[in-house]
């Protein structure tokens, strides 16, 4: 294939030898790409600080036998500058990157929608105009829609009957909202504001989302995180570090299919040097 160009977001870094790094990108046209940045750890590196997590960059790469090689980089958006000095935004941003990494298992598989969703979410976080936790939960919900894991909100996940406007109960193992006739044991009963917030975040209705109270936001965060991690079959290392006021309620997952708990927060869980793979997409017509 020789040389090729693309735009991408830096998801994570991994040390390679004395001076190099493996950089994992989510790109616009080529999905997830892992490439070697030679000499990047030297103070005289021609890449400078352009290949850091959260960076939105224009790339030229050369196809290698096992890993591609980064040959040119130009910064399009340095989102990290608006995140690293703000702990809530930084940790929310790390959760975005880790989710993108986990949701893309195959390198080179197109993920245009996810890429656009990720760039929009990072722009919203770095801009500082939206609540970082709402941005994070909107991203997680809409990424699950792209992945085919969206929780049912207005209809019963089991029988498909529409609520009026919502059903009373939510079950992660069942797939979201459930009617009284289909509800399994362990289903929780979200408040009406929580249901409205779930629907608003999924649809990109920021007027409704930003008008909700702290309790609805907290409960929504718990449902979204539980639903995502059920489908990933493992916990996200970065989510417990997201500092939500009042904490996030634990949701009963019932008989979870072997959910793996990440026991080591190191190895780049928060956007540093680490091995890993992953990527994402957005919901058509729903802008962050």
Q: Whereabouts are the PLM-identified features?
A:
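Non-catalytic alpha-helical scaffolds and adjoining flexible linkers that form interface surfaces
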Residues: 1-22, 26-288
């Amino acid at each position: 294939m020789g040389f090729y160009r693309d735009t991408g977001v830096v998801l994570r870094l991994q040390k390679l030898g004395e001076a190099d790094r493996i950089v994992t990108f989510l790109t616009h046209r080529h999905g997830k790409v892992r490439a070697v940045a030679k000499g990047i750890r030297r103070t005289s590196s021609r890449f400078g600080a352009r290949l850091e997590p959260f960076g939105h960059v224009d790339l030229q790469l050369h196809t290698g036998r096992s890993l591609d090689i980064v040959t040119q980089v130009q910064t399009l958006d340095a989102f990290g500058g608006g995140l690293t000095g703000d702990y809530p935004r930084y940790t929310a941003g790390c959760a975005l990157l880790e989710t993108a990494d986990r949701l893309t298992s195959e390198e080179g598989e197109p993920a245009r929608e996810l890429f656009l969703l990720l760039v929009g979410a990072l722009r919203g976080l770095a801009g500082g105009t939206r609540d970082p936790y709402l941005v994070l939960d909107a991203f997680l919900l809409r990424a699950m829609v792209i992945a085919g894991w969206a929780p049912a909100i207005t209809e019963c996940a089991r029988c498909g009957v529409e609520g009026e406007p919502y059903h009373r109960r939510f079950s992660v193992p069942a797939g979201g909202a459930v009617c009284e006739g289909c509800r399994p044991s362990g289903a929780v009963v979200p408040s009406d504001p929580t249901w409205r917030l779930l629907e608003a975040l999924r649809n990109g209705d920021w007027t409704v989302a930003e008008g909700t109270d702290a309790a609805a936001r907290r409960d929504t965060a718990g449902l979204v995180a539980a639903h995502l991690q059920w489908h990933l079959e493992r916990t996200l290392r970065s989510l417990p570090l997201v500092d939500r006021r009042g904490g996030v309620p634990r949701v009963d997952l019932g008989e979870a299919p072997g959910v793996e708990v990440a026991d080591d927060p190191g190895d780049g869980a928060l956007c540093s040097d680490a091995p890993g793979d992953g990527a994402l997409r957005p919901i058509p017509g729903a802008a962050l």
